[in-house]
Every structure is written in C-alpha cells, then in structure tokens.
C-alpha cells in the first residue's frame, strides 16, 4: 500500500484561482488541477492508495470553514481514499476548543504553515498549540525550511525546531520537506536523530519550472537525500509529494 502523506486540495469554486496564485509565486508547473477529483485522478494514475490532505489556514477566521471541509472529506474516505487533517492558526485564541473539535471529529492531526501564517515556529502560540495537540494524541505537520512562494523570510528553521523539541517534547511532530526545505545541511547537523519525523514532499527529483522561469532553486541531490535518510532512519521518514 502506498500512502501519500502530504497533499493539498482546494474547493472546486476557488481551485483554479488558488492554483494560479501559487503557480505565479513559485514559477512551477502543477501536477493536478488542485481539486479533490484531480487528486483522486493523479492517485489512480500513479498507484497511490491513500492520500492525506493538509489544509493551510492563512487567517484565523478561516478555521471553522476549513475544518468543516476536512470533516466532510474524511467522512467520504472509504470511497475516495483521501483523508484530511484539520487546520489551525496561531491567531486562534480558542486553540484548545478548536483542537478538541478536530479530535472529536476523528481527524488525526493538524497542519501548520509558519510562512503563510506569518509567525515564527518558535512563537509561544505555536508551542501552546503543539503542546495541547500532543496531549490529545494528534499528529502535527509543519512546513519546514524555505517556501519558494515566500522565500524572503524562513519562518521554520532547524534551530527553531530544536527549541520546540527541547521545550515542548512533541511525540508526533512531522517536519515537511525532509526537515527543512533547502536547509538540508543544517537538518543533517541539527535534526537527524532527534525525536521527530520528516516527510519527503518536494525534496527530491527535478523541479517542473514554467517555461522561461529563472531556476533559482534545486531539490536535494541524491547524495544529500540518502544522507538524511541514513542519518535519521528510514522508520522516521514519511512519503509525501506536496501535490498539486
């Protein structure tokens, strides 16, 4: 069985517009149309059995609507093969209430994205969210490292992760993009071997640049990718694509 642990979908009404914005920022080609149906089609084409959708809450007021969609997607899992995590924003003061709702709805975890939520990962608000999520037994996935759509400031660095690990001691923290996108030397030196998981999303292979786009970034080399796996342990690495 193949599980893609890191995917994204958008409501049909806004999928095209959202994907257009992401493409304009990243200068890369999408692999699907960003809809749930598009994800399911790509799963069939590539032989993926289960996909986990990781919603990103970019403003506090979005949390109720986004989590309602997550519940609906997850309720249809048997027929779709798609499971959704919940979302939360550091600006949500009622974070315990939100996390309790996510837990009671049967969702298995949450996604945090410090870049799109404009907060540093070692912010006390994230620490509180992660601490309570850990109490509830929820998985916490966080975008780690550079985001090519918002590259000017990195909101989740290996040093910030070390601080959270030392202070909060989360049991099920997953660092997307092999621990820190484009910061893999630091990840190797500071995070490999720590009590944390990493996913492979958008970390190995070739970037599908738009025609004429400046090739500013590269994914991890095969040598670095294997170094990270060997140093951290394959049992702590989760497969993910970052679809679309």
Language-model-detected regions and their locations in the chain:
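Short aromatic-enriched loop/helix-cap "lid" or pocket-rim segments at secondary-structure transitions
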Residues: 13-18, 64-66, 98, 152-154, ...
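An N-terminally biased module of ancient metal coordination in phosphate/nucleic-acid-related enzymes
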Residues: 1-61
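Hydrophobic faces of well-ordered beta-strands that scaffold small-molecule active sites
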Residues: 3-7, 50-54, 82-86, 108-112, ...
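Acidic (Asp/Glu)-rich catalytic clusters
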Residues: 40-47, 67-81, 97-107, 127-136, ...
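Divalent metal-binding pocket/active-site signature
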Residues: 32-33, 57-61, 90-93, 105-189
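Short, surface-exposed alpha-helical segments at coil->helix boundaries
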Residues: 33-37, 64-71, 158
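H/E-rich (His + Asp/Glu) clusters that bind or coordinate divalent metals
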Residues: 181-244
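Short, well-structured secondary-structure segments
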Residues: 47-62, 69-89, 111
């Amino acid at each position: 069985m193949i599980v893609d642990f890191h995917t994204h979908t958008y409501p049909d009404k806004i999928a095209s517009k959202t994907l257009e914005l992401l493409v304009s920022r990243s200068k890369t080609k999408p692999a699907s149309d960003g809809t749930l149906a598009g994800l399911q089609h790509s799963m069939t084409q590539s032989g993926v059995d289960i996909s986990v959708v990781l919603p990103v809450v970019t403003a506090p007021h979005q949390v109720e609507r986004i989590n309602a969609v997550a519940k609906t997607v997850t309720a249809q899992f048997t027929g779709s093969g798609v499971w959704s995590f919940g979302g939360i924003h550091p600006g949500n003061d009622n974070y315990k209430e939100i996390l309790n709702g996510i837990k009671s709805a049967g969702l298995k975890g949450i996604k945090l994205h410090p870049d799109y939520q404009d907060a540093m990962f070692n912010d006390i608000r994230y620490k509180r969210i992660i601490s309570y999520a850990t109490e509830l037994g929820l998985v916490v996935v966080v975008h780690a490292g550079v985001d090519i759509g918002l590259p000017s400031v990195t909101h989740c660095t290996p040093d910030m992760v070390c601080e959270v690990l030392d202070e909060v001691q989360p049991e099920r923290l997953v660092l997307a993009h092999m621990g820190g996108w484009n910061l893999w030397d630091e990840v190797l030196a500071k995070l490999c071997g720590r009590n944390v998981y990493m996913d492979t999303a958008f970390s190995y292979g070739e970037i599908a640049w738009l025609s004429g786009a400046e090739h500013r970034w590269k994914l991890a080399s095969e040598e670095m990718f294997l170094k990270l796996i060997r140093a951290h342990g394959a049992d702590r690495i989760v497969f993910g694509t970052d679809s679309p």
